Amino acid sequence: MDLDLTQTWSVLGWLEQAIDAKGVETCLLTYAARFGLSALFAGWVPRLDPSIASDISSRILFQKLPPEWAARYNKQNYVFLDPVVQRLQTDRNLFSWTDAYNSCSSSNDVKRVGGEASEFGLVDGLVVPIQSVDGALAAFSFGGGRLELGEEDAAAFAVVTNFAAGRL
């Protein structure tokens, strides 16, 4: 059986050569761009408890978003309304923002967070949850104007993102 893993080793090689978190972020965004994704938010997933709002900034690993959207999201504590974060409370599988919006019990949260994100060109995205051996949960949420991802691409995206997380 002939396997051509050239692309896989190339992408993992970029990540291996990244010397810091900024380099990992750049590699991930370069990889994500081929699927229509241009933004990245990653961090340790909080429980949905507004009393921990002051602790949220310490959980952020990457926040490469349109600056105005990042400021609004953080100032308004949208993390506690975000359908993506709500879904992460129970789902450890890769999913799209559309999946999160469709499964959200609050249409108001979908309209508020999803609607406002779309004003900044963040219409759809892909979320890769990463469960640590210690029980902590991180998630990498990639967003953009469109999500063009087949089933095999999604599995490969998860491999790349998990490898990147291991580089942090």
Language-model features: where?
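Juxtadomain coupling helices with adjacent low-complexity linkers
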Residues: 1-12, 143-168
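Short amphipathic alpha-helical segments
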Residues: 9, 13, 21-33, 110-114
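Helix-loop-beta substructure at the N-terminus of cytosolic sensory domains
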Residues: 21-54
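Positions that flank functional sites
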Residues: 47, 103, 132
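Regulatory sensory and allosteric helical modules in signal-transduction proteins
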Residues: 60-108, 114-118
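Alpha-helical bundle regulatory/interaction domains
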Residues: 121, 136-139, 164-165
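Short hydrophobic beta-strand micro-motif common in sensory/regulatory domains
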Residues: 124-130
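Sensory-domain boundary capping and coupling elements
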Residues: 130-144
